[in-house]
Regions:
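Glycine-rich phosphate/pyrophosphate-binding loop and the adjoining helix
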Residues: 28, 153-211
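Short, acidic/small-residue loops that bind anionic groups at enzyme active sites
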Residues: 118-132
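Cofactor-binding loop segments of dinucleotide-utilizing enzymes, especially the Rossmann-like FAD-
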Residues: 9, 146, 183
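Residues at the starts of beta-strands that form the adenosine-phosphate
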Residues: 3, 38, 139-141, 177
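Short histidine/acidic/glycine/proline-rich micro-motifs that form metal-
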Residues: 11-14, 149-150, 187-188
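Short, well-ordered alpha-helix to beta-strand connector turns
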Residues: 93-94, 138, 175
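Short, glycine-/small-residue-rich phosphate/pyrophosphate-handling segment
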Residues: 128-172
Length: 211
């Protein structure tokens, strides 16, 4: 039995977000084929995702120096608890499904803040004399990525830092990343929206078998 963490990184409701619609299709198919697995849904825009800032970095250094957690300011304790809860939740999962849009050639800022909660030296990777070593080597992920333009291939593929970044950072910590499901090009061809979404859903159905 596997534990699946379904991470939604769009503030838009499902009826508006085409990538979320495709992700729901993927999850429905996955649950049907893997009834014994457990699925936990994490909606980032409905979740407190603490930003890794000076306050948290200072608190981390103080704790490493021996300061008691209870001696931190109450609001700092609360932020650290929220941060650590996200870390623990991520590390406890076996599989990850990320659905996210392309914003200005990158990922949403809240998704980047979330990435910082689990890419942590000593937890998801470690430094050795031979370089960094991944610690999450028996886990899998799949990315479902929406964009108004087409960035998965062609001349514009070199412009985007969204899907390549998330894929690379997950591989860096040892996670095997399946081929991405792209939901793209609707802003270029609005009249083909239904066709594009249907094609992406077909890929989603096929992708479940290998996940």
């Amino acid at each position: 039995m596997s534990k699946v963490l379904f991470i939604k990184a769009s503030p838009l409701p499902n009826e508006v977000s085409r990538s979320s619609q495709v992700a729901e299709t993927f999850m429905e198919e996955y649950k049907a084929k893997n009834p014994s697995d457990t699925v936990e849904e994490l909606v980032l825009y409905n979740t407190e995702v603490p930003l890794l800032d000076l306050e948290l970095m200072t608190a981390g250094r103080e704790l490493q120096a021996g300061k008691a957690f209870t001696d931190l300011a109450p609001e700092v304790q609360q932020r650290l608890n929220a941060y650590n809860a996200l870390t623990d939740q991520f590390l406890a999962a076996d599989k990850y499904v990320f659905v996210f849009p392309l914003w200005n050639l990158g990922i949403p800022p809240l998704l980047k803040a979330y990435v910082d909660t689990f890419v942590i030296a000593g937890k998801s990777f470690r430094y050795t004399e031979h370089g960094p070593e991944a610690l999450l080597k028996d886990k899998k992920a799949i990315l479902i990525h929406g964009s108004g333009g087409i960035y998965s291939a062609g001349q514009t593929s070199s412009f985007t830092h969204g899907e390549p970044y998330l894929r690379t950072i997950l591989q860096f910590i040892g996670i095997e990343v399946a081929p991405t499901i792209f939901v793209e090009g609707i802003d270029h061809n609005p009249s083909k929206e239904a066709e594009i979404v249907a094609a992406a859903k077909a890929v989603a159905h096929e992708s479940v078998a290998e996940f």
